[in-house]
Every structure is written in structure tokens, then in C-alpha cells.
């Protein structure tokens, strides 16, 4: 239900993430997209910037909607309200700290470091795509160092 979700998305948060109230209200509910999300995240790797936060948030939202973590032998299928979060979970913030000669590891700083546009920074889709790009750039940088 959208009403439940709206309690967790303030106007300020929507603005930071570049959503309008209309876009938020027109978007599908978590219940509608949960089966597809569960299917996509059960096989790793999962790459994120401070990925532990993202994983905890996903677990929290799944639980709020009555999903349970699947046991090792349970299948994640549409309608069974189970989820698994895949491995490995790769944290680009930690990789930047370990491998890059930068003082800061936040995503915007890494965008600047790798000449990635800041135009839509904080929009969920852009952040996800840029995080993937940062991951590849860190791996490329590290392979050239060796």
C-alpha cells in the first residue's frame, strides 16, 4: 500500500532522490515489484556504495511486507514471499578506500575522480548505474597498477 510507503519517504527525501510526489504516487507499490526484486537479487554479485546499508534496507522492506528470508534449500518463487540476497556483496566505498589515491570515498567524489557526470546524482537509477561504472573503473585502475 502506498500509504505505508509514503510514511517512509518525506518530501525532502523525494526531492534529494529527484522524485516528485506525483511520480512517487504513480509508481508501482513495493508489493507489485517485490517478486521481481526478489528474483533479481538472489544471485550475486550485488554491487553498491556502502552496500551493507542497501542490504539492510532491502531486508527491512521485505520483512515489513511479510517476506521471510529463504533457507538455503528454499526456492524464491512468485507468491511464496521469500527472498535471498546474493553473494558476493561488493562495496565500492571500501574498494575506493583500499585501491584509490583519493582522500574521500563518497560517490560524488568518485564520480568527479572518474569524470562521471553529476547531473542526476542521487536519482536512484543514476546512482545505481554510476556505482556500477565506479566499480569497473576501480577494477581497471587496480589492474593497471599491478
Q: Model-found features: residue ranges?
A:
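Short, surface-exposed acidic
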Residues: 21-24, 69-74, 78-85, 118-122
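Conserved non-catalytic scaffold segment of RNase H-like nuclease domains
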Residues: 1-59, 108, 112-118, 122
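Acidic two-metal-ion nuclease catalytic site recognized across multiple nuclease folds
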Residues: 111-113, 129-146
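Acidic donor-binding loop at a coil-to-helix junction in glycosyltransferase catalytic cores
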Residues: 126
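Short alpha-helix plus adjacent loop in nuclease-associated cores
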Residues: 76-104
Amino acid at each position: 500500500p502506498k500509504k505505508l510507503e509514503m510514511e517512509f519517504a518525506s518530501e525532502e527525501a523525494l526531492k534529494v532522490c529527484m522524485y516528485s510526489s506525483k511520480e512517487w504516487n504513480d509508481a508501482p507499490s513495493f508489493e507489485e515489484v517485490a517478486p521481481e526484486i526478489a528474483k533479481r537479487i538472489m544471485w550475486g554479485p550485488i554491487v553498491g556504495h556502502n552496500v551493507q546499508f542497501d542490504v539492510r534496507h532491502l531486508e527491512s522492506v521485505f520483512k515489513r511486507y511479510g517476506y521471510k528470508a529463504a533457507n538455503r534449500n528454499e526456492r524464491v518463487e512468485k507468491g511464496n514471499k521469500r527472498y535471498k540476497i546474493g553473494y558476493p556483496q561488493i562495496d565500492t566505498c571500501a574498494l575506493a578506500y583500499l585501491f584509490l589515491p583519493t582522500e574521500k570515498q563518497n560517490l560524488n567524489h568518485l564520480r568527479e575522480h572518474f569524470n562521471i557526470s553529476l547531473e542526476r546524482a542521487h536519482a536512484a537509477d543514476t546512482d545505481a548505474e554510476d556505482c556500477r561504472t565506479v566499480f569497473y573503473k576501480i577494477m581497471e585502475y587496480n589492474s593497471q597498477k599491478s
